[in-house]
């Protein structure tokens, strides 16, 4: 199904918990800055995802909070699996990944994205309020070992981390990971000074690239191959290309469909209607009808 702007719905991002075992100073909590309603069960998540298939969803991204804190995560993945779904991936901080990688693979998870903003152990502790970077590295190694690949490293480009980019690139190249350089979206006034313009950085990477591809169904973002390393840039801020080619809807941990990454004022309740025995397809239609590019071309 397409929205009013001709954008197909192909991807569904599921936040399955607000809880996290780190406390990164920049975290936007998927747009839900306070704990709200009841957490969805594994069965409810499965039913909502199965309903989404009718509207064109073919890729699932699981996130949190930290999704590995849910002990029923393997069950959630098993409930999501369907022949129509081409890809189930998960975004994690990696702290618990070494422990659970094999179980997730066995349940049907295809691949993981791991957040890693620095390779400096002390800086990592500062950013995450006490996290152990060695646990993350071991988790990455285990994920690759069991086949949760292609593994992507999510690097958040900020004023305090950008000097780590060359080292992160070398690390990803060494382990065979894809690197995603993500623009920081400051959700609070006191964090705005951490934002940096990643356009010049992307342009510099582009000059060094051996090959450049365009990902049509991922906001038309570019993919650069630099000395064997695959690098992508995710630039949501003031980006008409990002918004104009968005194919994703989202589900909050408490059961609301979220039409737009950058808005929290047009959520559509789907969990409570499901619990009341309603046909939830009309709520997907409402969500899709609510979709519009946050940044529109002039």
From Swiss-Prot:
Residues that hold GTP according to the record: 13, 61, 91, 152, 248-250
Pathway: Cofactor biosynthesis; molybdopterin biosynthesis
EC number: 4.1.99.22
Biological-process GO terms, alphabetical: Mo-molybdopterin cofactor biosynthetic process
InterPro entries in the cross-refs: Aldolase_TIM, Elp3/MiaA/NifB-like_rSAM, MoaA_arc, MoaA_twitch, MoCo_biosynth_MoaA/MoaC, rSAM
GO molecular function terms attached to this record: 4 iron, 4 sulfur cluster binding; cyclic pyranopterin monophosphate synthase activity; GTP 3',8'-cyclase activity; GTP binding; metal ion binding; S-adenosyl-L-methionine binding
Pfam family, one: Radical_SAM
Domain of life of the source: Archaea
CDD domains: Radical_SAM
Domain Radical SAM core: 4-221
UniProt entry keywords in alphabetical sequence: 4Fe-4S, GTP-binding, Iron, Iron-sulfur, Lyase, Metal-binding, Molybdenum cofactor biosynthesis, Nucleotide-binding, S-adenosyl-L-methionine
Residues reported to bind S-adenosyl-L-methionine: 26, 65, 115
Residues annotated to bind [4Fe-4S] cluster 1: 20, 24, 27
Cofactor: [4Fe-4S] cluster
Binding, [4Fe-4S] cluster 2: 243, 246, 260
Cofactor: record remark: Binds 2 [4Fe-4S] clusters. Binds 1 [4Fe-4S] cluster coordinated with 3 cysteines and an exchangeable S-adenosyl-L-methionine and 1 [4Fe-4S] cluster coordinated with 3 cysteines and the GTP-derived substrate.
Reactions catalysed: GTP + AH2 + S-adenosyl-L-methionine = (8S)-3',8-cyclo-7,8-dihydroguanosine 5'-triphosphate + 5'-deoxyadenosine + L-methionine + A + H(+)
Function according to Swiss-Prot or TrEMBL: Catalyzes the cyclization of GTP to (8S)-3',8-cyclo-7,8-dihydroguanosine 5'-triphosphate.
Similarity remark: Belongs to the radical SAM superfamily. MoaA family.
Protein name: Probable GTP 3',8-cyclase
């Amino acid at each position: 199904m397409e929205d009013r702007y001709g954008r197909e719905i192909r991807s569904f991002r599921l936040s399955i918990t607000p809880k996290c075992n780190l406390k990164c100073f920049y975290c936007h909590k998927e747009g839900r800055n306070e704990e709200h309603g009841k957490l969805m069960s594994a069965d409810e998540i499965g039913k909502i995802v199965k309903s989404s298939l009718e509207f064109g969803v073919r890729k699932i991204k699981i996130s949190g909070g930290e999704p590995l804190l849910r002990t029923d995560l393997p069950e959630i993945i098993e409930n999501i699996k369907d022949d129509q779904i081409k890809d189930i991936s998960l975004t994690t901080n990696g702290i618990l990944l070494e422990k659970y990688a094999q179980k997730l693979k066995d349940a049907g998870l295809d691949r993981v994205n791991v957040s890693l903003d620095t390779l400096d152990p002390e800086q990592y502790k500062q950013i995450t309020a006490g996290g152990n970077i060695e646990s993350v590295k071991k988790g990455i190694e285990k994920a690759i070992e069991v086949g949760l690949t292609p593994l992507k490293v999510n690097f958040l480009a900020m004023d305090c981390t950008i000097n780590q980019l060359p080292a992160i690139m070398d690390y990803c190249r060494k382990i065979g990971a894809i690197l995603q350089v993500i623009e920081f979206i400051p959700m609070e006034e006191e964090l705005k000074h951490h934002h940096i313009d990643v356009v010049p950085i992307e342009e510099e990477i582009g000059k060094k690239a051996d090959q450049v591809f365009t990902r049509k169904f991922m906001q038309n973002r570019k993919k650069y191959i630099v000395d064997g390393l695959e690098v992508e840039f995710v630039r949501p801020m003031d980006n008409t290309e990002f918004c104009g080619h968005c194919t994703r809807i989202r589900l909050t941990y408490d059961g609301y469909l979220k039409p737009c990454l950058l808005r929290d004022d047009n959520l559509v309740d789907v969990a409570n209607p499901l619990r009341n025995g309603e046909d939830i397809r009309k709520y997907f239609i409402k969500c899709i009808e609510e979709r519009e590019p946050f940044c529109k071309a002039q």
